[in-house]
């Protein structure tokens, strides 16, 4: 390390340049080399008070930043410092835009800070208006569901269940510097790997474990059995519905036939005789006894069979005594009404068959022919003889009313 040279050594090394640099050297020497000072000491022991002068040398240390080479003696400025918060990360763009949207006074009717003036939450008063007019101004979409999903991603929670009010510990009114503390939630790596594996297995159709294959097969078999059972129930219900529709149609047809039959009986008294003649011509008489009973019934149509039954019952009670058996009389009384009722029942069945077989046009022609062959004056003042036989036609058909 070289030591600084004194002016005397510098002059000795360069004798020729002594005159040229005398002015600069003298000024430098005056600055660097202090002038000797003398101090006077008064002594009381010497004659005449002789004053002794002793030279004292003052050393001046060079300050930091001063050079010895004769340059400018300036102060070096301190090194530059980085700006405050230059290395820190700012808030997320979504959080910053959401804060600007909530703090904007022009959107208070749609979204604003929560009631109470605390500023710890914000409320979306009109989600439809927010999605239609406010979100496109701050974001690149107009979907309210996507906005809520992003709020959940950044840690916002719904405060009130009956309205869209959200809050976060670092999302406060007037404290925008806290927004940098709101970070996006990151999914853990194992969870991401499991989700990717699940997606891959679903895409390629491969189950995760053999146990899942067994459970899927069991569920498939159960679903197939349930489908088969539902098909059977559907077929049974369909067949029952078809049978019920057919039964309803038959009942309606029988009702219409019954109404038409009674209407024709009331309008044309010869209609019953025509039906009986058709019955005789079709089936014939089976035996002389049966023909005789039918003739007796036609001749004695004025007598009511119900009255005959009542008279027969009274005769039976009068003839039977406490000491006698009376078997013959009782047997005679019991067999006769039974035969009449059976014959009438068979005749009614045949009447139904005749009604089904006769076409409508033929029946109308028969009515016209019957009406034309009788005069109205013949029926005036003469009671109808077939009225008493109507109960025998009504009793077998009581099932229509029920």
UniProtKB/Swiss-Prot annotation:
Where are the annotated segments for Disordered? Answer: 1-28
Q: What is its main location?
A: nucleus
Q: Which UniProt keywords apply?
A: Coiled coil, DNA-binding, Nucleus, Phosphoprotein, Stress response, Transcription, Transcription regulation
Q: Where is this motif: Nuclear localization signal?
A: 290-293
* Example of a GO cellular component annotation carried by this entry: nucleus
Concerning SMART domains, the annotation shows:
HSF
Residue window of motif AHA:
349-358
In Gene Ontology terms, what is one molecular function of this protein?
Answer: DNA-binding transcription factor activity
Q: Where in the cell is it found?
A: Nucleus
Q: Which domain of life is it from?
A: Eukaryota
What's an example Gene Ontology biological process for this entry? cellular response to heat
Q: What Pfam families does the record point to?
A: HSF_DNA-bind (PF00447)
Q: How is it modified after translation?
A: Exhibits temperature-dependent phosphorylation.
Q: Which InterPro entries match?
A: HSF_DNA-bd, WH-like_DNA-bd_sf, WH_DNA-bd_sf
* Region listing for Hydrophobic repeat HR-A/B, in residue ranges: 216-266
Coiled-coil-forming residues are 212-258
Q: What does this protein do?
A: Transcriptional regulator that specifically binds DNA of heat shock promoter elements (HSE).
Tell what the record comments on domains: The hydrophobic-rich region (HR-A/B) corresponds to the oligomerization domain. AHA motifs are transcriptional activator elements.
* Family statement drawn from the similarity comment of this UniProt entry: Belongs to the HSF family. Class A subfamily.
Q: How does it assemble?
A: Homotrimer.
Q: What is this protein called?
A: Heat stress transcription factor A-6a
